[in-house]
Each structure stands twice: as C-alpha cells, then as structure tokens.
C-alpha cells in the first residue's frame, strides 16, 4: 500500500475513545502537520497536553464539551453527518495548554496540529463564522468551509478547511501545489486529507505527483481514509453517484496559502 494512503486504525486508547487516525512526524514524511481523528462514545472524555504545537479541534460529527480548564465551550457541534453540508464548530487551543473533550453524544473529532511558539487565546470558531465559498465551474465545482484560513489571525501556523465535492466533479483542480517557499508566487505548505464518501461504500481517486515525477502516486481512496501530501500536485476525482467530503490541514514555515497550478492543465480555467 502507498505510504501516502492511510486506512483507519480504530484502536481503543481509553474507555469510550477510539483512535481512528494518528499522523505524526514519526510515521509520515511531514515536518509541520500532525493529525488525529477520534471517535468518542457518549460520556467519554479525552485529554491532551500540548507542548510545542497548537491544535484546532474540529467537531466532525456529534456534540461535545471542550475546555482548556480555564474556558469551557459546551454542546458544540452541529451535525450528525458531514453530508448535511453545513459548517461545524471548532476550537483553537495554543501551545503549552491542556484541553479536554467530553462527548455529549457519540462524536467524531479531528485534532489538527502544527508547530507553535507564541501563545494565543483559546477560541471557539463558531459554525456561523466559517467562510463558505463555492469554487470552480462545469465539472470542477466544490463548496468550501473555511475554518482557519490565512486571513484569520487566530493561529500561528495552522490552516484548516473542509471541502465538499459533488458526484462526477473534480476538486483541488486544476492540479495545484504549494511546496516551494517562493513567495509571492508560491508558499510551502504540507497538507493532509481526511476523506469521507457518501454512500460509504464508494471511493474517490487522488493523485499526488511532482513535475519531475519522482513522486507520482494515484490512489483509490475509500471512506474514512487519509492521504498525506508532503509535496506535489494533489487533485481529487469523484465518480458518478457518490459525494466527497474532505478535511484539509495545512502548515509550513509561513502561514500563507499561495498555490501554483500545473501549467499543463491551467488552460481549463483560462
């Protein structure tokens, strides 16, 4: 199996808490981005102390309480399925803080991490504060929920976004990349994709490739799989009859999202 494609682990790490994914610098070719997905049974609690990283807690589904033991946000989360296609609540927690998550209902949460040195306030990112965009045209259309865009100064390194792509469409397309620290033309950002597919027996295709093809992998990505993008272009194709959701986490040396389209395919938007 590709080193870029990750299947769910589903390991119970404490009572009522199941680790679905755990992407770290130790098990992935990433320097800036880390990611966990957790399933919590109703009433279960998960706690973690951050050291040199910040974290964005995304309530993917269900309802939870989140606290940093100074500030508490209760009953956050807005949906039972991501395919309700409405924004959800998230919480930003800075480095050197401890946070706890208690499940009010059965819940899935995503923990998105990036390096951080400067402490910032814990912040509730309300669903209604997500910027919603509709991008593309033709069979290249998708809806975007901006949870932590680069225009929001709430984080030091993290960029977090949800993308919904309908049946028969492409996203992250035309193929683009952000793997060179070459501003203003391009920024260097690693990225992870957490995928869901509806109906759940479906799949999408994702290709990750570089100009010189030293990296060139095309993957069949199933429901709840992850794809790691250390560098290169990374388009996603959604077959007829299925809908795609993915949660993107990006981070790099500068908190700016500036991508570069593959010149061979940029003509489709000209």
From Swiss-Prot:
Q: Is Glycosyltransferase given among the entry's keywords? A: no
The protein's annotated catalytic reaction(s) are: 5-deoxy-D-glucuronate = 5-dehydro-2-deoxy-D-gluconate
Q: What are the entry keywords? A: Isomerase
**What are the recorded Gene Ontology BP terms?**
inositol catabolic process
**Pathway it acts in?**
Polyol metabolism; myo-inositol degradation into acetyl-CoA; acetyl-CoA from myo-inositol: step 4/7
Superkingdom of origin: Bacteria
> Which Gene3D superfamilies does UniProt cross-reference here?
Jelly Rolls
Q: Identify the EC number(s).
A: 5.3.1.30
What is a single molecular function from GO for this protein?
5-deoxy-D-glucuronate isomerase activity
What job does this protein perform? Answer: Involved in the isomerization of 5-deoxy-glucuronate (5DG) to 5-dehydro-2-deoxy-D-gluconate (DKG or 2-deoxy-5-keto-D-gluconate).
Recorded family membership:
Belongs to the isomerase IolB family.
Q: Which NCBIfam families match?
A: myo_inos_iolB
Question: What protein name applies here?
Answer: 5-deoxy-glucuronate isomerase
Q: Species name for this entry?
A: Halalkalibacterium halodurans (strain ATCC BAA-125 / DSM 18197 / FERM 7344 / JCM 9153 / C-125)
Taxonomy of origin reads: Bacteria, Bacillati, Bacillota, Bacilli, Bacillales
